Amino acid sequence: MATSSFNINELVASHGDKGLLATALVDKTAHEQLEEQLQHQRRGRKVYIRNVLGVKDSEVIRNRYGGKYDLHLTQQEFAPHGLAGVLRLCETLDCLDSFPSSGLRQDLVLDFGGSWVTHYLRGHNVHCCSPCLGIRDKMRHAERLMNMRKIILNDPQQFDGRQPDFCTQPAEDCKVQAHFAISIHGGYDMGFRGLCEAMNAHGTTILKGTMMFDGAMMFDDQGVIPELNCQWRKIRSAFSETEDVTPLSGKLNSTVFSRVRKFKTMVAFDFINESTMSYVHDWENIKSFLTDQTYSYRGMTYGIERCVIHAGIMTYKIIGVPGMCPPELIRHCIWFPSIKDYVGLKIPASQDLVEWKTVRILMSTLRETEEIAMRCYNDKKAWMEQFKVILGVLSAKSSTIVINGMSMQSGERIDINDYHHIGFAILLHTKMKYEQLGKMYDMWNASSISKWFAALTRPLRVFFSSVVHALFPTLRPREEKEFLIKLSTFVTFNEECSFDGGEEWDVISSAAYVATQAVTDGKILAAQKAEKLAEKLAQPVIEVSDSPEASSQTPDDTAEVCGKEREVSELDSLSAQTRSPITRVAERATAMLEYAAYEKQLHDTTVSNLKRIWNMAGGDDKRNSLEGNLKFVFDTYFTVDPMVNIHFSTGRWMRPVPEGVVYSVGYNERGLGPKSDGELYIVNSECVICNSESLSTVTRSLQAPTGTISQVDGVAGCGKTTAIKSIFEPSTDMIVTANKKSAQDVRMALFKSSDSKEACTFVRTADSVLLNECPTVSRVLVDEVVLLHFGQLCAVMSKLKAVRAICFGDSEQIAFSSRDASFDMRFSKIIPDETSDADTTFRSPQDVVPLVRLMATKALPKGTHSKYTKWVSQSKVTRSVTSRAIVSVTLVDLDSSRFYITMTQADKASLISRAKEMNLPKTFWNERIKTVHESQGISEDHVTLVRLKSTKCDLFKQFSYCLVALTRHKVTFRYEYCGVLNGDLIAECVARA
């Protein structure tokens, strides 16, 4: 498994505006923390989330589903109540994952009220019951039809022969039978019992569903679900939120109200600060999911189990069982955590004090207000004076106060309509308490009774008091009016479930039957897969003929055009090949799919970054104009990406374009793509070469190759290029390299030219092979193969129809690494069929051999096998390595005869700036200053490694990077460094040599 790692400075320089966020992570623990996050993401299927989510919303979705799915938040588009939409998608996948996904008819899943187009596009084995209950449902159907057409037009081969599976009937009327069902926010209009009856009609035994949940609905008339930014409110009419004053006779005679649910309490769900459609549902149906537990219907007993309540969403399951159900007490609780700090206070709701209502007040506010009211009470004062005192204290405890110029919220604001009634209720409560306490004191202080009662011993007093209260209840003190009510933080529901459904359900026999059927179905599926694979492998391999006529008759030659997908049936797709019983075919197909997904994510990230810059500069997706503070925005982004720029419609650039740089694409309101000189658009560093989407598309259109992959794993300088030169046959071979520099080196070695037609025909980069027309060959020779993703290597073999690939590379040097730190890279490492080693170097001088051995001993884990522990050198140079400390970049000796390498882009930029200050030729700082990663595969006589900072850099601890740095030279190597860097592997080994 490949490990995804990255350097913070490279991240900042390559990720556009995201680099602004990354700079905050540059500290001593940043690398470890990000690695932990990557490990956390390595699980489950990938789920791409297009909706723009804030930081809090992103945390909600990651906390809920980040452990199950590999979530990719592309932040591409704004959507109404974005988090709710994202949760709905993940809830759908989560509920479907509870059931078998064989694709067989017996494993069909029903979806009550879901989106059929979601299942169609993802290929789910689901039948959707999507009834048209009103204009909203019909609007949704029209929109789904449009979305389906749009997506099919972009990829018709994928959906060829596939039909959407849905009906427009209510769930209880649909005749499709299935054992399993889901209901994603579809139970509001059916209720618990309605869902059970629908399950019975379909023969469904298990249903998983979700719904918005707030336990406070049992207590309050309105509230907020903060995670969803949703406000709910109980209303009395389907058309108005105020009480309907139409006379009863008028309602009964009204043709309008005869069609709506009259006299029922509805719950309206409104999304705060979003002027979008709300959802209105029957409170009785919603309440049933909170209170009901079992329901017996037509020989089946259905029980609901509330599984998870998170972020205002409750996941539940309903399971139906046949036969008799012995009596059993079923108990569950609905909790109200939001009211644990509150107390109920009864206040008058009418002037005659007959009607009262209960309001919630913070316990701290009421306690302090009542305490002051009791201490300041005086029965000789007018009631209004005492009323004003209470109102003043109540206001101070529930309003905004200013302290030292800072405004602070004290307590919680009270409804303006309840404020005076609350104060009046507290006054009545205080007066009543004083009157009752006075009566109690007078009764206790009565002369004859109190003296006689006091003369009794304590046991007699207790006994006498109990007898009197039991025999003469009217002698008790008058019961006080209940003003204060303690609010319970939960409510309990107990139900005795008992049902006589006839014969007892034989669970043991059912288990045996299910196991037998599952084995039979599994064998059928395996046989089908093996048969399809055998048919595929039975096709003969088409060898390349020397005859031009024979070559022209190759079936796919005329169809292979850059960017065009071949028509591959669903059964022959990469996805099908990943399930191949032939291990290497499955491995290669999986790697190709990962490579295609990786390139697609790079493209999506580029689009997301550019769209964000465009929007911040005042642009939108409709007009070709920018209206923001362009200089401020682009100066900010320029600090992390010097290639960020604006091309105006006049043809002028905001900043001078670096010499030799040509932007192939740009971004504006029409998206990312080629632009004309008369357009306004923006660019960044990813717009110079933007081929990720094309690479992804081409790779997905290919099939995993079945040819042999051989790897020559040689040490640095073992003569890999010489070996390629010696075995290359122009009639049957093509040479493929990982990058343009390696291709130029091989062309010079073979053809003494880097740009001749012959050299460019036979020596090409992997990207060039995939993106352009190329002849088919029987063998491909690959240089520096470790810099390629395994999936890209397989795609190259498939495109060239090669039956053999001979790959040269060093498995211990810098391997392919992801440019997107968030991508879960698992299958990038080359998996060869044959491997051979070469442990003799002809390039590295004699003193480099023990240095590399020492580095391997110090850097690699104990027990790790390394070919560098036994490598030898045939070089005649005996001493080549030196080092010296420098104070700054000005002391670096820049000489045109030397090749300069750095570990980081920042140090490289400093050296280039220094070279420009010294007026050195452009060819020097363009070709003679590279990073270690860029210099892999390069061979030079004199090399200088420069480190200009002593801040933490993990690259100096990695054996692969240090190995490449120390093995580029033939004659001399000089290490020039500023300050002491802890863990500097090269400095430690050079010092001990």
UniProtKB/Swiss-Prot annotation:
Residues 72-290 form the Alphavirus-like MT domain. It is found in: Host endoplasmic reticulum membrane. ATP binds at residues 714-721. Residues 712-975 are annotated as: ATP-dependent helicase. It holds the Pfam family CMV_1a_C. Its EC number is 3.6.4.-, 2.1.1.-. Keywords: ATP-binding, Helicase, Host endoplasmic reticulum, Host membrane, Hydrolase, Membrane, Methyltransferase, Nucleotide-binding, Transferase. Residues 51-409 are annotated as: Methyltransferase. GO terms for cellular component: host cell endoplasmic reticulum membrane; membrane. The keyword Cell inner membrane does not apply. It is a peripheral membrane protein. Residues 687-838 form the (+)RNA virus helicase ATP-binding domain. GO terms for biological process: methylation; mRNA modification; RNA processing. Residues 839-993 form the (+)RNA virus helicase C-terminal domain. One of its GO terms (molecular function) is hydrolase activity, acting on acid anhydrides. Residues 544-575 are annotated as: Disordered. InterPro entries: (+)RNA_virus_helicase_core_dom, 1a_necrotic_phenotyp-det_dom, Alphavirus-like_MT_dom, CMV_1a_C, P-loop_NTPase. It comes from the Viruses. Involved in the virus replication. Contains a helicase domain and a methyltransferase domain. The methyltransferase domain is probably involved in viral RNA capping. Involved in the formation of ER membrane spherular invaginations in which RNA replication complexes form. Interacts with RNA-directed RNA polymerase 2a. Belongs to the bromoviridae replication protein 1a family. This is Replication protein 1a. It comes from Cucumber mosaic virus (strain Iizuka) (CMV).
